[in-house]
Amino acid sequence: MSLDRILIANRSEIAMRVARTVADRGGKSILPYTAEDLTAPATALADEAYALPAGSGYTDAQAILELAKSTGAQAIHPGYGFLAENVEFAKAVIEAGITWIGPAPEAMEALGDKMSARQVAESAGVDPVPGITDAVTEASVVKEFAARYGYPVALKRTDGGGGRGITVLYNDDEVDTTPALDEFQTATPGTAGGTVTQILEKFITHARHVETQCARDAFGNFAVVSTRDCTLQRRNQKLLEEAPAPFLPADIEQKLVENSRRLFEAVNYVGVGTCEFLYTDEGGLWFLEVNPRLQVEHCVSEEVSGTDLVDIQLRLAEGQRLPQLEPVQGHSIELRITCEDPSRALAPTTGTITGVHWPAGHGVRVESGIAVGDEVTPFF
C-alpha cells in the first residue's frame, strides 16, 4: 500500500521536514494549524492546510483525527512532541482505519514510561541505570537506596521526557525537604492521560549520553543507522549532538547495537526509534529509555548515513522491508538555536523575529520553521 496523503500532526520545523519527504515521494501533505500559525512557513509549505477549531490545538486528538477523516488522509505522522507518544491517540488513529506512522501502540505502551521501560530492559538482558523500578513515595526508601549506591540520586517522573520531571538529590537533608516526594502521595495525572508515579535511580555524574538511531521492519530486520553523542546539555535539554558518537571503543559500540536490538525485539518494535544510554570512560553502559518517534537530532544520523529517516518511517508503515543502509561516513554536528534571554539566566523568551541570516555552503544543513516577522509566542 502506498501512502500518498499524509496528515502531519505537528508544526514548525518538524512539520516542514516531514512535508519535504512526502513531496519527494510524490505525495500530498495535510497540515492542521492554530491561529498563531496562520502565516507560519510550515502552513505555507503544506499542500493542504486547515485551521483547527477555535480553542483547540496540536494536542487535541479528537480534532486532529476528525480532520484526518474529513480530508481523506491515509496516514498520520505525529512528528515529535504533542501527540507523538500518546498511546490512546495512536490506538484511535488505527481504529479509524488510518495508518499510524510509528511503532504499534503496544510497543509504545511498553516503552512509554520509565518504569515499564526499565522492566522491558531487565527482561531483555539490558542493564538499566541502577535504580528502583517500583513507585517511590517515601523518603526512607530514597535514603536506603542512597546508602547502598551513594549520592547523588535522581527521582524521575515516569512520564518525563525532554528534561522534564527530574529531581536530583545530593544528601539526606535534600531528601527530607524535596517537594517531589509529596507530589506523588496521591494519584497524579500524566501529561498524556492516566496517572504517573516516579522511580528512583542513581544519578551518574561525568557520564556521556550516547544513543542509537534504530530501525526495524515487520520481518524482523534491524539496523542501527548511526550512534550519536548528546552529552552537551543545559537544564537536561540537548544543545549539541554529534553522529557518530566519537571515541567509542569497538566493544562498546557493538554492545550498543546488540542492546538496542534486544530492546526492539522485546516489544516487537516496528518503525524508527532511538535507544538512549549512559556511558562512562570506565566502561559502564546503562540503558536510559527508548524514544518511539523521530527526534530533533535525527538530522545528524541522516547526514552521515545518506538515509532519509522520514522516508524509512513511511516505508515501514507501508509494510516494506528495511532497505540496505550505507556505512556511516564522516561526522555531523547539530547545534540547536534557542530563544533565550542571557540577561535572565537564559530563561526562555518571546518576541518578534526581526532578522534571520542562516549559514550556507557545502555540508551545511538548516532545519527551521521561522521567518522574519514571525512572533515567538509562549504557546509552543
Enumerate the language-model features and the residues they cover.
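ATP-binding N-terminal substructure of ATP-dependent carboxylate-amine bond-forming enzymes
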Residues: 1-124, 136-144
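Conserved beta3 strand of the protein kinase N-lobe
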Residues: 131-132
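ATP-dependent carboxylate activation and anion-phosphoryl transfer catalytic cores
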Residues: 2-29, 46-50, 69-71, 94, ...
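Acidic/histidine-enriched active-site and ligand-binding environments that engage anionic O-linkages
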Residues: 144-155
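Conserved A3 ("GATE") glycine/threonine-rich loop of ANL adenylate-forming enzymes
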Residues: 114-116, 159-165, 330
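Short alpha-helix boundary/capping motifs
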Residues: 96, 148-150, 174
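Conserved, charged catalytic cores of large soluble enzymes
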Residues: 169
